[in-house]
Amino acid sequence: MEPLDALEKHGDIKKVLTEKLATLPTSPGIYQFKNSAGRIIYVGKAKNLRNRVRSYFRNSHQLFGKTLVLVSHIDDLEVIITSSEVEALILENNLIKELKPRYNVNLKDDKTYPYLVITNEPYPRILFTRHRRNDGSIAFGPYTEARQLRSILDLIGSIFPVRSCKLRLTPDAIASGKYKVCLDYHIHKCKGACEGLQPEDEYRQMIDEIIKLLKGKTSALIRSLTENMHLAATELRFEQAAEIKAQIESLKRYAERQKVVAADMVDRDVFAIAAGEDDACGVIFKIREGKLLGSQRIYINNTNGESEASMQLRMLEKFYVESIEPVPDEILLQEALSEEEEETLRAFLLVKAKNEGQEKKGIRLVVPQIGDKAHLVGMCRQNARHHLEEYLIQKQKRGEAAREHFGLTALKELLHLPTLPQRIECFDNSHFQGTDYVSSMVCFEKGKTKKSDYRKFKIKTFEGSDDYAAMDEVLRRRYSGSLTESLALPDLIVVDGGKGQVNTAYKTLQELGVTIPVIGLAKRIEEIFTPHSSDPFNLPKTSPALKLLQQLRDEAHRFAITYHRKLRSDRTLQTELTTIAGIGEKTAFKLLEHFGSVESVAQASREELQAVIGAKAGETVYTFYRPEG
């Protein structure tokens, strides 16, 4: 996957999206793109939210037509995590039909996913339908594929002798003898209920078994079918075995049926909470007519060890006081309320419903432990955890930004700078007994590192140890010539050192005609030096200005030490190779650059060495490490 810092380089990605892209989960779910007005302009589903959403921006140069226009209007995004891609597909369909986003074109039609319905009759039928009934019939679904639903109907028909006729089998009609059995009875697909050959209670018992099957209690049935499949294969009835295998696969697919949409058509809210040390996030799923139409979030701060049950009650009260949505028939909760709390909340909701013209006899408050309702609460809690994590990351970044701003403001006031030091450059020297003398320059912009503007210098104008001369050389190279043209000038220069370093830096800058404030920060006791000041001054250890200066100084020191160690390592490694007759520094460097270490050079074959440095030199190095020939 392309890293986030690469995504940030694309010009078409807004800054507000960058942080959200960094926290996207890899779970399945739906994503909603919003425009600058906060309006949802597109809803999509994904098996992996992180990969799918990032693909819009990673490959933006390859987009065309409406998709390109869509991306140009994206200002924000929200996600809802689901348990499977199938759930995401159902939720996507529901949201598109409800919200009608501008850039959704594929699911705006009125096509409805099919349901399996058990009719409300003395001898119920099992039907395929795309329209829900409100006559007491029992519905299961929806199904994303009509083919899958038809295979389940075939499966049920192959296991249970359910009637397929459209006859109105009332007790009087059956008793009158007006109906006769059809072919299904003779091929054992029906038990002749139309002629009274199957009692109603026996038929009802069979329907109850089918309902159990449709509710997911399929393990025993699968075991039975598997035994039948093996028996058929053993008896060489391969066609029948294949049919049974297909039935098992259909049954297994059904076991993974959709749970986002509840079949009972009840209007309900689902509430769950996720809590951190000091913050908590509550998520409310809004389910209307069995469809999950969206979610809302509530955050509370400074929880101070408050229980999740207590926070849940606070959030529920806040949500329903402010909500303009109709009061649902049922609320699924993560934590149980006390009897008094439950009665208070229920009474408030009933009054609210009455004031809004709703007629409700009662409102169910349920803490489900198993089944589809528990699944909904679990999915809601998973979303709460995700949003809390995202919130805490944003909170941390806001805190860091505040500290950085305080640090810059404190520096401006402390040093009497004309403007806020948005860009600061810091220099540090490093050497070992006068050898491999180097210097580093690091850059902070708005209190954060800007590594693309880091520079490292190898001292060229003298040999030995002279920190002042090194500082003079580095500042001249930085603030004159090509670097002055390629890099913006800073608002403040910081050098690692005391009075001598600061005065040297000031003198060099004066000679170059550079009027940028410069200060020094000495190690150990953290004294701050300014040019021409006889005495340094100290800042409190908790000062945001001091912390920012320490970050700068430590980063410059780290960068210088890293470069210095690399030079020493390269020089040390080249020493052994350059002792080989006929091998100079350039050849040694080529070997190290290709093989990575002296050990790898020593173990290389003759052919490998010759491919890098030529036949003669390769033979020389190969023979050096294998004197025996």
From Swiss-Prot:
Record-linked Gene3D superfamilies: 5' to 3' exonuclease, C-terminal subdomain, GIY-YIG endonuclease, UVR domain, UvrC, RNAse H endonuclease domain
Occurrences of domain UVR (ranges): 219-254
Location of this chain's protein in the cell: Cytoplasm
Keyword annotations: Cytoplasm, DNA damage, DNA excision, DNA repair, Excision nuclease, SOS response
Pfam (any one): GIY-YIG
Protein name: UvrABC system protein C
Role: The UvrABC repair system catalyzes the recognition and processing of DNA lesions. UvrC both incises the 5' and 3' sides of the lesion. The N-terminal half is responsible for the 3' incision and the C-terminal half is responsible for the 5' incision.
PANTHER family in the record: UVRABC SYSTEM PROTEIN C, UVRC/OXIDOREDUCTASE
One Gene Ontology biological process: SOS response
Keyword Cell membrane: no
Example of a GO MF term: DNA binding
Assembly description: Interacts with UvrB in an incision complex.
Domain GIY-YIG residues, every copy: 26-105
